[in-house]
Amino acid sequence: MADWNPALYTRFEDERTRPAAELLARVPLEAPRLAIDLGCGPGNSTALIAARFPDAEVIGLDTSPAMLESARARLPRLAFALADAATWTPERAPDLIYANAVLQWLPDHATLLPRLFGLLAPGGVLAVQMPDNLAEPTHRLMRAVAASGPWAAAIGDPAVAGRLGRMLEPAAYYDLLAPAAAEVDVWRTAYHHRMADAAAIVDWVRATGLRPFLDPLDPEHRAGFLDAYTRAIDGAYPPRSDGRRLLAFPRVFVVARKAS
């Protein structure tokens, strides 16, 4: 895929940061020495970690040069580096591996999450938050529109572009981590974000889930796809009593602590 667009991503920064803050609030650590923000994006979550743990060494990692540039501009005193969560191995064991809205992009969670948990120092915590919205209208309509227009061949299999089959049920994450953990906390929350109109909902997903559908398209097909998708979204998210739209957005949270 093309590189991420930090400006588009941060257009809804308050809404995107809320689950990051709620994940961090459930981390059962007092004074970690080394905290890794895995998939740090533009640094909004890294700033939360640094504020809560001011004495910790906090390092942000991401695969996107554009996101890392934005994070460094936001937090010039912190360290950021290019790294892939699928293969990353730390030089020394972290006390906190914090992965907010990143692991949903990666396959094989049955291997990935236990691997990350195993990298922790004794007493360390793996904290994960992942969107769980592939069954929501935003994502069902991505796949439907992708399969039905002149852009279908360029996009390919909508199930692949839509990352179907990667997310597990919340209880499965518990089962993966509980045998090796001192404590595992798993929960699922559905946020309902107030959006101005259908175009705002499209802008939200253009920064994230819509990228694998749009990136392969030439400008003409991209415009046509967005027009068809926006019309579909307009029908799926009708105006509420104040004229706004409500975007339902489920997320899964996992916090696992290693024995000391």
From Swiss-Prot:
Biological role stated in the UniProt entry: Catalyzes the S-adenosylmethionine monomethyl esterification of trans-aconitate.
Family: Belongs to the methyltransferase superfamily. Tam family.
Predominant location category: cytoplasm
GO terms classed as biological process: methylation
Tagged with keyword Cytoplasm: yes
Protein name (record): Trans-aconitate 2-methyltransferase
Keywords: Cytoplasm, Methyltransferase, S-adenosyl-L-methionine, Transferase
Domain of life: Bacteria
Location of the protein in the cell: Cytoplasm
Example of a GO cellular component annotation carried by this entry: cytoplasm
Native species: Methylobacterium radiotolerans (strain ATCC 27329 / DSM 1819 / JCM 2831 / NBRC 15690 / NCIMB 10815 / 0-1)
EC number annotated for this UniProt entry: 2.1.1.144
A Pfam family annotated for this UniProt entry: Methyltransf_12
InterPro entries (UniProt xref): Methyltransf_12, SAM-dependent_MTases_sf, Trans-aconitate_MeTrfase, Trans_acon_MeTrfase_C
Enzymatic reactions: trans-aconitate + S-adenosyl-L-methionine = (E)-3-(methoxycarbonyl)pent-2-enedioate + S-adenosyl-L-homocysteine
A GO molecular-function descriptor: trans-aconitate 2-methyltransferase activity
Keyword Acyltransferase applies: no
